[in-house]
């Protein structure tokens, strides 16, 4: 079984974890037809993508 030779410091632990934070979604697009907000390159909740109806509900 592997055993560490030196204990990692709090600083090294923090540096390793520095990229683990979650970021907020900043790039929301507005659909031309319905004016609804959605993630880029995704359809809206009512089935529109780039002004066209792609899924019939």
Curated annotation (Swiss-Prot):
Alphabetical UniProt keywords: Ribonucleoprotein, Ribosomal protein
Entry's Gene Ontology molecular function annotations: structural constituent of ribosome
Entry GO terms, CC: large ribosomal subunit
A Pfam entry, by short name: Ribosomal_L32p
Superkingdom, natural source: Bacteria
Statement: the UniProt record of this protein carries the keyword Ribonucleoprotein: yes
BP GO terms, sorted: translation
Official protein name in the record: Large ribosomal subunit protein bL32
């Amino acid at each position: 079984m592997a055993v560490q030779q030196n204990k990692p410091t709090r600083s090294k632990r923090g540096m390793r974890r520095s990229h683990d934070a979650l970021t907020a979604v900043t790039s929301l697009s507005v659909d031309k037809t319905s004016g609804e907000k959605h993630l880029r390159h995704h359809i809206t909740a009512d089935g529109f993508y780039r002004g066209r109806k792609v899924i019939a509900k």
